[in-house]
Amino acid sequence: MSAASPASIIQELASAAKQYENNESGAREALIAQSRALIASLEVPSEFIQHTFWSQPALSAIVRLATDVNLFQYLKDAQEEGLSAEALASKTGMDVSLFARLARHLVAMNVITSRNGVFYGTALSNGLAAENYQQSIRFCHDVSRPSFGAFPSFFKGNGYKTPALGTTDGPFQSAHKVDISFPQWLVGNPPYLQYFNSYMSAYRAGKPNWCDNGFYPVADRLLNGFDASVSDVLLVDVGGGRGHDIATFGSQFSPLPGRLVLQDREQVINSIPADESRQFEATTHDIFTTQPVKNARAYYMHSVPHGFGDEDAVKIMANLVPALAKGYSRVLLNEIVVDEESPVMSATNMDLIMLAHMGAKERTEADWRSILTRAGLKVVNIYSYPGVAESLIEAELA
C-alpha cells in the first residue's frame, strides 16, 4: 500500500482541524499525527537525514543544557516582555555569541520565539520550565539517549537478538558501561531514580485517562449493573501505587455506589499520606498471591503485568480468577496495546524504551489475548482513545 499523498493528508488535516475547533475527542492527537505525516510526505532523503541526525540531536542537547541554566524559567518569568540575548546570556552565565547560536536553533525548532532581537517563551517552553519536566529531560538525555545510541553496535555484537527480560547485558549496559540491571542502577544513582519517577509521572501528564469521557464507558460498563448484594466493592486498583488512578476515578464519578480499594506492597501503602477526605481504602497485597477481595464489580490494573515476562503475567492474571463473580466481575487492564497494522508513535516509543533499558517489550493484541486466555479469562473488548498509547482491555471469566 503506497503512502498517502500530500493532498489527501491536507484534507485529513482540515477535517481534524474542524474537529479540534469543536473540542472533539482525539482531534488534537489526530492533528499532530497528520502534521507529522505531511512532513514525511514532503521531505526528501537529505532533509530527513539532516532532521534526524542534526536538528533533533542538537535540539535534545540544547534542551538538556537549558535545564542547567534555567533558560525556560527565565523566559517564563519574563512573560510578554521577553528578554534580549544579552540579558539571557547574563542570567544563564553564557557568552552572548554562544547563547544566540543555541537560542536560534530553539526558535527554528519552534520551542521559543524571537522578534526584533528579543526572545519569548511559548506555551511549550513555559510548560517545560516545570520541575517534573526538567527532571524528565535530564533522564531522557543522560540515560535513554545513550542507550538508543548503543543499538547499532550492541545488536551487531549480539547477532541481532532480543535481550533477555531484566537483562544485565543490553543496550543500556553497553552505553553506560555497567553490568547490573537498569532498576539496580537507578537505586544506586539516586538523582536519576528521582528523574525517572518524574519522567514516568510526566509521561502520563495531560493525557486522557481511561475513565475520561470518550475512552471507557464507565457508566454503562461499571456503574450500571452494580449490585451491592454481590459485593459492596465497586473497584479494586491492584498494584495501584499511591492511588493516583483510583483517586481520579473517585473524583470523576462521585458519589459512588460502592467502595474503592487500593492495593500495593506494604512499603508503598505505608508511604501514602494520611488523608481523611480520600475516597479509597488502602490495603497491602502481593500480586503473586490470590486476590483477597471477592466478587468486586471490577479489578483494575495500570501497567502491572507490563514489566513482567509472559509466564509471570499469566500468574498475576490467574490470581484474580478465584475472586471473580461469573457474569458480573470485570478485569480492566490499562496497558499499551501495540497495533501491528497501524502502530502509533506513543506506543512504539515506549516499546523501544523497554527494549533499550530492560530487554522488555510492549505487547500486541494477540499477546494480551494469549496471556488472558492462559489465565482463564477472555477479552470482552479493547477500548482506545485516538493518539493515546494506552488502551483499556476489558476481560471476564472465560
Curated annotation (Swiss-Prot):
GO terms for cellular component: cytosol. Changing E362A: Completely looses methyltransferase activity towards demethylmycophenolic acid (DMMPA). One of its GO terms (biological process) is mycophenolic acid biosynthetic process. Optimum pH is 8.0. It is an enzyme of class 2 (transferase). It holds the Pfam family Methyltransf_2. Its EC number is 2.1.1.-. This is O-methyltransferase mpaG. Optimum temperature is 45 degrees Celsius.
